[in-house]
């Protein structure tokens, strides 16, 4: 069952800590996946259609912090890399957003400083697309970057690759 990151975190990390001996909680934990983690499992089981209609070119991908914390791996990159004539460069650095950190007056400058290394890498890459699994992180980096209007969600690009505009 693909779910958003907060739901997944609650079901696979928080609830099992609160109710470690509850078998129903363990069943729920085993049933939750990050969307690209789920798609990767389908691909490994030869159940994911990979007859993509369009290539995506050069993609800069900011790996969301929650994915590193949840040990998901780079499944988003792996799935998008299945698309012909598509290169995905993963940037595993902090966006500096952290919920409200980037929008609070007292922490905004620190947030920008934290994001700078990632923004530089994205600027240097000159991507056709910029993505992040975290909408807030993606928009923060896109706003700070030289030539990006906005970030795209990886699912949006996958939809484009399948020809479902």
Where are these regions (language model features)?
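Active-site glycine- and acidic-residue-rich loops that bind
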Residues: 63-78
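C-terminal structured "cap/appendage" subdomains that terminate the fold
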Residues: 99-154
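Single conserved hydrophobic/aromatic residue that forms the stacking wall/gate
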Residues: 1-8, 12
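Conserved hydrophobic helix-helix packing surfaces used for dimerization/oligomerization
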Residues: 58-59, 130
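Short cysteine clusters
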Residues: 11, 65, 95, 134
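Short connector loops at secondary-structure junctions
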Residues: 37-39, 86-108
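Peripheral docking tails and interdomain loops at the edges
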Residues: 16-21, 25, 33-49, 141-165
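Short helix-loop-beta junction
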Residues: 74-91
